[in-house]
Amino acid sequence: MESSSAGVSAARKNGLTERNTVPARRSKVKSFDLADRWFNRLGRFAGAMHEGFWLGWLNADELNAVTAEHFDQSKYYASPGHNLSGFFGWEKSVLERFFQRGSRILVAGAGGGREVLALRKAGFDAEGFECSVPLVRASEQIFERLGESKYVTLCEPDRVPQGPRIYDGLVVGWTVYTHIPTKARRVAFLQGLSERALPGSPLLVSYFARQSGVSDDVLVHRTARFWRFLLRGRQEPLEVGDRISYARFVRSFTSDEVEAELRDAGFRSAHHGADGELGYTVGIGE
């Protein structure tokens, strides 16, 4: 009996302890949730101030220099592992649908040669151009090891090498379009590509996609406008979706925005698709 009574007493004591512990635990959890929300808000605000300051102050050429520094130092984009990896799944399906095998393709922003190599392996006559000297050199080393000619040439940022209309299709390298600052430069870039292609040629563009009215994009945009006014910074217009991410300029788009820029450059939109946060569009030259 004594043992039974002691057990009941201990159980009651443990129950009281548990009941006293639960409110304290709940209080700590609530405190954590509150602190975490405010920490994240402060982080977003600090990030918006940082991105907005530089977006409002740096002009398009300076943003290009920031982006170039990122890609010039990239070991990933220069690596044989990346450049010999072939097409992404979405690239393969789009190319099979809109591009005729055996046709002549120009790749803009060809990097270390991934798209050019994959296209040539798939039976296309492909060549490209790139503005990063280290990436062009990396492509030359890869082509040399494969016993191939050097199919990637150097070109200035946001420019297209001049020449005759000889290409049957155009490919803007993986997310290259998303790193070109200002709508005017992007449209001029597309027009330059159009001038190298035969009428009716397909164009593939990939980019970072966004939904309209994303709060972080709006916050960064407003902050950039404030700093531009305060510092009398860049003269080019600022756009919602302009960001600085991983030490490079990044522009994210809605499909409607991409379609409008293609139309301004003389392409009609033929197909939209998405792969996670990546969007891609096929335009047809008119």
Specify the residue positions occupied by each region the protein language model found.
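A short SAM/SAH-binding and catalytic strip from SAM-dependent methyltransferases
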Residues: 169-184
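Conserved class I S-adenosyl-L-methionine
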Residues: 25-100, 102-111
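A short acidic, Gly/Pro-enriched loop at the edge of an enzyme's catalytic core
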Residues: 161-170
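Class I SAM-dependent methyltransferase SAM/SAH-binding core
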Residues: 112-159
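Core SAM-dependent methyltransferase catalytic element
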Residues: 271-286
